[in-house]
């Protein structure tokens, strides 16, 4: 099961650990667009679509988790910063089973969605930072242009 955080703008709240994550620039895609990207990328990587589920996950609202995911599941995390530690504390506050895959510094994380969005906003090359199938969909949906429009509005 893969959780998509910030699935609905009404479920997004500002987080002290990462104030940017609740911005429009950080969330330019709809839940369904992110669902399609994840599913397409996983299938492209050879994962059978019947082997996974993708669900909305209002990560900043632990009281809602039970409506979206089985609480007896193991919650896997990768931690790169204070926000990752905050997510872990949300899970632990409910007594959920948590498994940290790895914890490395933000600098060692590698490419991030923020990096890709920033490249798009600046009109720089980004396609080599995502799977081919994802690049096709992002271009088809006009996401670079959407991000540039958001940037102009926020400037």
Named regions from a protein language model:
Residues 1-155:
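Nucleotidyltransferase catalytic core that binds NTPs
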């Amino acid at each position: 099961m893969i959780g998509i955080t910030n699935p609905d703008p009404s479920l997004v709240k500002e987080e002290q650990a990462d104030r940017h994550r609740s911005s429009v620039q950080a969330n330019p895609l709809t839940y369904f667009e992110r669902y399609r990207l994840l599913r397409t990328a996983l299938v492209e990587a050879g994962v059978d679509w019947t082997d996974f589920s993708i669900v909305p996950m209002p990560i900043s609202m632990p009281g809602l988790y039970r409506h979206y995911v089985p609480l007896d599941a193991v919650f896997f995390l990768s931690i790169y910063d204070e926000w990752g530690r905050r997510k872990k504390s949300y899970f632990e506050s409910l007594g959920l089973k948590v498994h940290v895959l790895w914890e490395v510094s933000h600098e060692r994380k590698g490419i991030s969605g923020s990096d890709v969005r920033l490249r798009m906003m600046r009109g720089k090359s980004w396609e080599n930072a995502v799977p081919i199938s994802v690049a096709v969909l992002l271009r088809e949906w006009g996401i670079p242009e959407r991000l540039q429009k958001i940037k102009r509005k926020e400037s």
